[in-house]
């Protein structure tokens, strides 16, 4: 009987250790140099692109676009297509391309993409006419997000961020940084 307990304990410990190795993310210092480097470069590219877009200077848009393109393969949360859509809006809206990018980001449950889709169809913004039913669908999709259930960011806060990013009369982007 004692051998069975030891074997079971050993098996349980082994499975736990194996699961830990398999589930290790690139955020861990021991996750491997290449994995960690890719994660850090992705984070750097996204941070730089966001800052360039929030600054609102059209001279920075080409670099922001290149950074987003390079970050694309590492994106799992829909950030890249969301910020690509914001870039297109700020450069001069092409509605179909913007909608395609936002739908890609929304499919990955990006909260700001869903808030921007709501804005497009509720005001209307970019679209020629409002579509209240479609807008409500996006409002409901936002409410189903895990972040919405936790209360951060609230729908109103997500809308404020979106408004700051696409409002060409406020190029400073001060609200985006939380000031």
For the regions a protein language model found, what residue spans apply to each?
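Short helix-capping/linker turns of helical repeat alpha-solenoids
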Residues: 38-45, 52-56, 60, 73-81, ...
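Bacterial N-terminal signal peptides that target proteins for export
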Residues: 1-11
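C-terminal motif of bacterial Sec signal peptides marking the signal peptidase cleavage site
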Residues: 17-20
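Terminal, low-structured helical/coil segments at or just beyond the last alpha-helical repeat
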Residues: 129-179
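Bacterial signal peptide processing site
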Residues: 22-25
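Structural signature of tandem alpha-helical TPR/SEL1-like repeats
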Residues: 58-66, 91-101, 128-134
